[in-house]
């Protein structure tokens, strides 16, 4: 089965359409990830491709990760299931980071291709973590759609880079309700909150126009730019310190210490804020593995 298909038009835009066969909602599997990864490699290597758009063949974008995949990953890892889970999460991080860097030179940040996501409807969990790794997110003006990272509500936390990216995008205080409470928003409010970039009646047309006109500067995430400073400050900055103290108190007050996912999430945020982005992803993977192995 093929969950991802790619088409290319005369203007050089490659469109990757996610459409899980036999399912009403897209859910990510490791097989689908490998399919997507191969198509991304193909598009990045093709000189005729000027940019890439990720979208869905269904009314919604995606519901998240197939939780059975995580269980299978743990069970298939033999005597060291934690290592298997960690390596599996790291492989997702590598694919998403490849999308984020999009062929850019590591030193000059030049030579990349614009990659946008078009959300026709709901995007949750890894179905939002994937768009967060792209350069722009365009959503349909669909008030019934929900956008966010609700993993904490099922005893997990965003482990495919969503925790680290959202905190570096919004700052710890602004990101807290989405990460620690699993808050989701319709597209218009998601845009106002800074989760996505555009809401319109025709997001595909907007995405195509952006891809064709994007500059090299448009592709560089803030955390890959020199002099980046986290909104609200890092834990060792005075304002950031108070943010993290407040978040810690909120977690303890709401969970009474009984829910390891919330504590692990906060640890990933705190530790990840103090190190370069690539190392922060490894920290996120380590804490996610800890939660999965010790629910």
Question: What are the roles of these predicted feature ranges?
Answer:
Residues 54, 66, 130-131, 190:
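Hydrophobic/aromatic residues within transmembrane alpha-helices
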Residues 56-95, 123, 153-155:
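Glycine- (often His-adjacent) and acidic-residue-rich active-site loop
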Residues 13-18, 30-40, 174-176, 180, ...:
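Intrinsically disordered, low-complexity segments enriched in small/flexible residues
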Residues 68-76, 129, 134-141, 169:
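A glycine- and small-aliphatic-rich helix-loop capping segment at beta-alpha/alpha-beta transitions
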Residues 162-173:
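Hydrophobic, secondary-structure "cap" segments at the distal end of domains
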Residues 1-55, 79:
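Conserved CoA-thioester-binding segment of acyl-CoA-metabolizing enzymes
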Residues 99-154, 158, 178:
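Glycine-rich beta-to-alpha active-site loop
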